[in-house]
Amino acid sequence: MNYNKLIDHTLLKQDAMPEQIVKLCDEAKQFDFMSVCVNPGYVPLAAECLKGSDVKVCTVIGFPLGMNLTKTKVEEAVLAVKEGAQEVDMVINFGMLKAGHDDYVREEIYEIKQAVGRNIILKVIIETCLLNNDEIVRACLAAKAAGADFVKTSTGFSTGGATVEAVRLMRETVGPEMGVKASGGVRSHEDLLAMVEAGANRIGTSSGAKII
């Protein structure tokens, strides 16, 4: 398996500087990673750095809390795509999910997917460390019903990251036809292999150059 193509090479720290984004892109090209994942403000820079390469530009929407208005998330996603993003990782409204408003969560994901279009990969961050197993299942089913391309474990900015148990449950819930991205705390080749074994087919990590 080409593990390089599983990796979203990630830098989402709030103090990330332009030269660090350039380095991120250079490493992604060197190792032929699937994408770089950067905050929306750095999408134009990443798109310019990666022009002519196979590495995609990924960004985050409603990040990291997910508590924005749906229309704000939609506008943010559309603008990011206009600026060069090819993949969008959105954060759901966890409070609405926990309150049992699965229809709200599903509709929000659907609106963003419709807005960015079928050619843009949409990943749905469900922040598994904040959810029990029932909530993980419900979040995954909402994302699948809304037409998302992936479900993703974590923002990397909450109380925990990806776990083998959560990834396995997510894969069991969405089946083989939908992607599962493990993100948060994947820092070694052994971590990567464990997540892939559990069912992940995309890995979000800031340590891509070290773990391959």
Features from the language model and the residues they span:
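Alpha/beta enzyme core
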Residues: 1-31, 41-63, 67-180, 188-210
